[in-house]
Amino acid sequence: MANRKRDAGREALEKKGWWRSHRWLVLRRLCQFFVLGMFLSGPWFGVWILHGNYSSSLLFDTVPLTDPLMTLQSLASGHLPATVALTGAVIITVLYALAGKRLFCSWVCPLNPITDLANWLRRRFDLNQSATIPRHIRYVLLVVILVGSALTGTLIWEWINPVSLMGRSLVMGFGSGALLILALFLFDLLVVEHGWCGHICPVGALYGVLGSKGVITVAATDRQKCNRCMDCFHVCPEPHVLRAPVLDEQSPVQVTSRDCMTCGRCVDVCSEDVFTITTRWSSGAKS
């Protein structure tokens, strides 16, 4: 029998203990705050580890790291980025293409804790009503951004990019940008379940495409143990990616959809240990 959304993870907590039912969540938060700390260590303490923001930065003033979407906008607008920016984009593209799926979204993005909080509150207070918008709208928005950059000759997304805006706000203070971040929080809380990360964000859409054939993946390796409690579906920001691996015995046990954020919450909340985080070659996934 399916559990209520507000009770998602309770069985796992009782059966596996706190650490094993929150392990991947804790590790993700540590990773997110570690990356954020590398950005903040310079302006706050004078120790520059990551110099810049989430769109473009230098690691130890040496290794460039550039958001691929910003680079694509620059190319589309007719402006060839500097060699250091192109190098940074290649590094990030190769890194996430090899690692897999949307690891940036769940392990690095500073907005993820905010949207996670909104959706935890949604479950906690039984806010089950949700507007319906197509998940592919993020890919449409991605194309619109690139076409818009080509037509205007500007990096149009960077004017409102909430990911880089969040990083800048933490360094320079929350001004009007706080209103956009608050709007995203309320959108996820009151309008569309997993609305930003699961439906709209073009940054996540691009990382999903880049990492679609990467190494790291989630697999329902012991799906025969599934008791249909639905806790994994309740907490997953992209629950449609779990249907085939969990419910269709003819499908590969691996989550092969590029929409998967590899956040590990399905692993945490499953009281039967159906899921593992593994490599794409270990369970016979379709390529």
From Swiss-Prot:
**Could you tell me what this protein does?**
Required for electron transfer from ubiquinol, via NapC, to the periplasmic nitrate reductase NapAB complex.
* UniProt membrane topology term: Multi-pass membrane protein
Q: Which is a Gene Ontology cellular component entry for this protein?
A: plasma membrane
Q: Please state every residue range assigned to the domain named 4Fe-4S ferredoxin-type.
A: 217-247, 251-280
Q: Describe its partners and assembly state.
A: Interacts with NapC.
Observed effect of gene inactivation: Deletion of both napG and napH genes has little effect on the overall rate of nitrate reduction during growth in the glycerol/nitrate medium. However, during growth in the glucose/nitrate medium, the double mutant shows a decreased rate of electron transfer that correlates with decreased NapAB activity.
Q: Which SUPFAM superfamilies match?
A: 4Fe-4S ferredoxins
**Segments on the Cytoplasmic face:** 1-29, 101-139, 192-287
- Gene3D superfamilies this protein is in? 3.30.70.20
Q: Which residues bind [4Fe-4S] cluster 1?
A: 226, 229, 232, 236
Q: Gene encoding this chain? A: napH
Q: Which residues lie on this side of the membrane: Periplasmic?
A: 51-79, 161-170
* Keyword Acyltransferase listed: no
One Pfam family recorded for the sequence = Fer4_5
| Residues reported in the UniProt entry to bind [4Fe-4S] cluster 2 | 260, 263, 266, 270
- Write out the transmembrane intervals: 30-50, 80-100, 140-160, 171-191
Cofactor(s) listed: [4Fe-4S] cluster
* Keywords tagged on the record: 4Fe-4S, Cell inner membrane, Cell membrane, Electron transport, Iron, Iron-sulfur, Membrane, Metal-binding, Repeat, Transmembrane, Transmembrane helix, Transport
The identity of this protein, by name, is: Ferredoxin-type protein NapH
- GO molecular function terms noted in the UniProt entry: 4 iron, 4 sulfur cluster binding; metal ion binding
Principal location: membrane
The listed locations are:
Cell inner membrane
How is the cofactor bound, in the record's words? Binds 2 [4Fe-4S] cluster.
According to its UniProt entry, this protein's organism is: Escherichia coli (strain K12)
